[in-house]
Amino acid sequence: MPGGLEKTCHQCISKIASNACFVVVLCAFLALPLSMTFIGMKFLEDCPIQPLIPLYLLVGGIVGTLKVSLLLYDSTRMRRLLSKAVVIDDDDDDEYPWRQNAHRYYIHLLLSLFLFLWFILGNYWVFSVYLPDFLPPFQQPQDYCDKTLYLFAVGVLALSHTVLVLLLLCSGCVYLCSRWRLAADED
């Protein structure tokens, strides 16, 4: 990545992450993994047809809470640094914090990778038993899944799909705009 583009991306991410609205959105977003954890724990034994659905919610909720908490910590730390008017010199090694704090960067990367793979597994587990019986059938009492648990899992996946599509669209727009801007600068 050219140095100018890297610096521009860093400045853009820094402005977004240090914005108070971003912190509020992260706090609101923390409700989803916490509710996933709660629903997963509450209904852990209530889906014998696919016992991995409550486990998907439980583990995804715990790891998601950890990920959002780390993002909140990083964002508030950046806000604190900016409020102290810390000016980073262009020649300073601290210009790109992810280079200096590589361990934190790799933790975020690993958590994101795990959550993405867990999301794929969750899709398989939830939709492999699409619309199960919500009450235990008399003949086969093991072929059911609690309605609240199942519909919550489907809702979480639908929300995740929506956010993923929006992120891909926004990333594509940013990429196209940056390419267009670079082409305009070269002319």
From Swiss-Prot:
Keyword Lyase (UniProt): no
Major localization listed first in the record, in broad terms: membrane
Keyword Transmembrane helix assigned: yes
Transmembrane region(s): 21-41, 52-72, 107-127, 149-169
Compartments (UniProt record): Membrane
Record keywords: Membrane, Transmembrane, Transmembrane helix
Gene Ontology CC annotations of this record: membrane
Membrane topology: Multi-pass membrane protein
PANTHER family the UniProt entry points to: SI:DKEY-19B23.12-RELATED, TRANSMEMBRANE PROTEIN 272
The protein's name in its UniProt record: Transmembrane protein 272
Gene label: TMEM272
